[in-house]
Amino acid sequence: MARKCEITGKKTMFGNNVPRKGLAKKKGGAGQHIGVKTKRTFKVNLINKKFFIPELGRSINIKVSANALRSISKVGLDAFLKKNCKKIENFL
């Protein structure tokens, strides 16, 4: 499976490493030398989590991001799925 949150759709992003070294010119240095940028990936913090659904009387396994897991613990799984326009039947 893809490295993607099944609820929020968060996935790996791409960007640059920007090394900032040296003292700024305003502070009397030679500058910060932001010349060499290298590509990098920002990976999602994914967790395989088992949730119990009392209406169905069974558990489901969902690959969810840590950020979504915090939100689920605050408002509950049903409310969070409703907010993100998802249905429990999609995960069975």
Swiss-Prot record:
Transmembrane segments annotated in the record for this chain: none
Sorted alphabetically, which Pfam families does this protein's record hold?
Ribosomal_L28
Molecular function terms, GO-annotated: structural constituent of ribosome
Instruction: Provide the Gene Ontology terms for cellular component.
Output: ribonucleoprotein complex; ribosome
Gene3D superfamilies in the record: Ribosomal protein L28/L24
Q: Which SUPFAM superfamilies match?
A: L28p-like
Q: Which domain of life is it from?
A: Bacteria
Q: Please give the biological process terms from Gene Ontology that the record holds.
A: translation
Q: What is this protein called?
A: Large ribosomal subunit protein bL28
